[in-house]
């Protein structure tokens, strides 16, 4: 049997719309992500369980894990008779790369079970293709960090999909999911078709400056540049209480705060555990909207998708 865990991720990381993503893992050891197990069988079957299993499609054919199996068999020319089990621990429409978790775990498990017929580049391309069926377009800012780990910059040039960006080990990432759903497709549709020249210049300056600050080890500069002029001004209205949460996080010592992916999850960056705990406590008390919500203090997950057991 093969069992693969794929971690949650932050798409965009405020300054890198569709081109920057980061995998995260809670300090307390919680597996914040999906797991897919595969075992040999006489025929294909898919079973699902987990905290958020009720949010999955009602038919097997609509499930993205089934579609991963189907597409993997097409690409490799092999009809794999396997029993697949999806442990759906990630809320759908959360801004934590939920669909990427399922896709990455499923395809990485299939590839491992089949003897790794696809190299990492081809597998990542396939992950982007399958995740795009849910998000509405192919982009790698969730699947790349989920699969490869760490902070990843999407390049898609010279057959390079993404490359790692050095980040700061002292940074803690407070992740708060309020328990409501935001559709990625709807969150993309709310964005304007055109941006002003000033916003384009600011976006380029923030992203380039952030990458430069990461490579030159300037954490305060990197944090100061984490300002989103592309998505956050338009999406914040989809997140009840976001403006108050961002203001409170800053007052409690957060270096930066932004929307994770399309939301509604937000992240706050701290360089001190005491500040991170204070931010986490405030968010748990004021940002969560129901019992489905949660808050985790995380670090970047450098490992990405990995086999368990």
From Swiss-Prot:
Coiled-coil boundaries: none
Record's protein name: Homoserine kinase
Gene expressing this chain: thrB
Gene Ontology molecular function: ATP binding; homoserine kinase activity
InterPro entries: GHMP_kinase_C_dom, GHMP_kinase_C_sf, GHMP_kinase_N_dom, GHMP_knse_ATP-bd_CS, Homoserine_kinase, Ribosomal_Su5_D2-typ_SF, Ribsml_uS5_D2-typ_fold_subgr
Gene3D superfamilies, per database record: 3.30.230.10, GHMP kinase, C-terminal domain
Function, as annotated: Catalyzes the ATP-dependent phosphorylation of L-homoserine to L-homoserine phosphate.
A GO biological process held by the record: threonine biosynthetic process
Tree of life domain: Bacteria
Organism annotation: Edwardsiella ictaluri (strain 93-146)
Annotated EC: 2.7.1.39
